[in-house]
């Protein structure tokens, strides 16, 4: 085999079907579009979601919920995240520097998820009851 003799396998390539080129082709005259009507015309199709004038589904259903603008300023941290940090004094700045929380976070909650074995001091963070108990059981403190 040589590079100049490589060919596609038999049947792998076919000619593009040309429409509107005579009765014998099977796609002549109306080019497979049938007779008359909106769908037979050029540009004759409705936009996505259009239901022929009937009230569309997305307008029939009620609006629900909203996007809280406070979300980027709140963050949750797991106990397993605290375990992985190289420092023992943990505050918002330490979490931001470690990349555990986003730069915009202002309020941080420590939640009981995962486990903690090392002694850490948590400052300036909110801790849930379970998380506080787990930190104190490991010999740490929540200030």
UniProtKB/Swiss-Prot annotation:
Disordered: annotated span: 1-52
GO CC annotation terms, alphabetical: cytosolic large ribosomal subunit
Pfam families documented for this protein: Ribosomal_L27A (PF00828)
Disulphides: none
Annotated keywords: Ribonucleoprotein, Ribosomal protein, RNA-binding, rRNA-binding
Composition bias, Gly residues: 21-31
InterPro entries with a match to the protein in the record: Ribosomal_uL15, Ribosomal_uL15/eL18, Ribosomal_uL15/eL18_sf, Ribosomal_uL15_bac-type, Ribosomal_uL15_CS
GO molecular function: rRNA binding; structural constituent of ribosome
GO biological process, one term: translation
Known partners and oligomeric status: Part of the 50S ribosomal subunit.
Role according to the record: Binds to the 23S rRNA.
Family: Belongs to the universal ribosomal protein uL15 family.
Protein name, UniProt field: Large ribosomal subunit protein uL15
Source lineage: Bacteria, Pseudomonadati, Pseudomonadota, Betaproteobacteria, Burkholderiales
Gene from which this protein is expressed: rplO
């Amino acid at each position: 085999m040589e590079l100049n003799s490589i060919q596609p396998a038999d049947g792998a390539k076919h000619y593009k079907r040309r429409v509107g080129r005579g009765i014998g082709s099977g796609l002549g005259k109306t080019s497979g579009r049938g007779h008359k009507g909106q769908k037979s015309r050029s540009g004759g199709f409705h936009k996505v979601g259009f239901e022929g004038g009937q009230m569309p589904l997305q307008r029939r259903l009620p609006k629900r919920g909203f996007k809280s603008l406070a979300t980027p300023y709140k963050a949750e941290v797991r106990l397993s995240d605290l375990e992985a940090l190289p420092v023992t004094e943990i505050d918002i700045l330490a979490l931001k520097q470690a990349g555990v929380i986003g730069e915009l976070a202002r309020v941080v909650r420590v939640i009981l998820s995962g486990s903690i074995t090392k002694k850490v001091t948590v400052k300036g963070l909110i801790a849930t009851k379970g998380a506080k108990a787990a930190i104190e059981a490991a010999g740490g403190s929540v200030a």
